[in-house]
Amino acid sequence: DPIASHSATIVTTPVFEQQMAWLAAHRYRVVPLREVVAATLGNAPPIEGPAVAITADDGWRSVYTQMFPVIRREHLPVTLFINPPMISAGSAYLTWEMIAEMRASGLVDIEAHTQTHPNFNTERARRTPEAYAAYLTQQIGGSREALQARFGVAADLLAWPFGIHDAQLEAAARQGGFVAAFALGSRAAEPGGDPFAIPRYQVYETDIGARFAAVAEGFPRGRGVVQASSSRPIPSSTPRKAAISP
């Protein structure tokens, strides 16, 4: 995929493996994202550092073909934020069968990333206030309903497309049944923070060696949510792509 091969948000599999090896060598624990949510909400004690949670957005197929073998081998919990209508919609995306296999491993949690990954700033500008409110219900609440219908379990975590969120969007997420939502922000998730704007560090292909150490050690008290950038499939002749989430 020529677009993927030039994307700044791609992390190749060898680099992802190096990053995970650095965390292991420096005694970082990779914890399930729900532990971060529980600590943020005050429903559990603060996470003892150093620790990180890993997320990946968008549901690209390379998460299954490239990333999943690594997380299964290393037994790493990962949360995927997906857009339900895009699944099984083409060769670039995960299929529901792939997702079922990953969920069955007990390592992969599937959560919502809205229905179609909209830019909410753009969509607000092109709609009346009433139409925009209805659109939010469809995009936000609809994504949770689709995942709950598919898996029969609560899918109550949300990742904001492009990291865009505001008071109206957060209210729509609450009304849609979500308990927490994730943005960007390159800072640590802290107990008592806004549960609908939990920050994530975005990690890049260039974050290796000293650069990755600087990112990891910059987490206040060694805690952070790492967002694996979305990745797309690429020709087998080029380095394999994977993504990790801060």
Where would I find each of the regions flagged by the language model?
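Metal-dependent polysaccharide deacetylase catalytic core of the NodB/CE4 family, i.e.
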Residues: 1-7, 26-29, 45-52, 60-61, ...
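N-terminal pre-catalytic segment of deacetylase/amide-hydrolase enzymes
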Residues: 1-52, 217-246
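Short, solvent-exposed turn/loop segments enriched in Gly/Ser/Thr/Pro and often Arg
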Residues: 34-40, 114-116, 159-164, 185-190
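Catalytic-core region of carbohydrate-active enzymes that cleave or remodel glycosidic bonds
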Residues: 176-185
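A cross-kingdom marker for long, charged
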Residues: 185-215
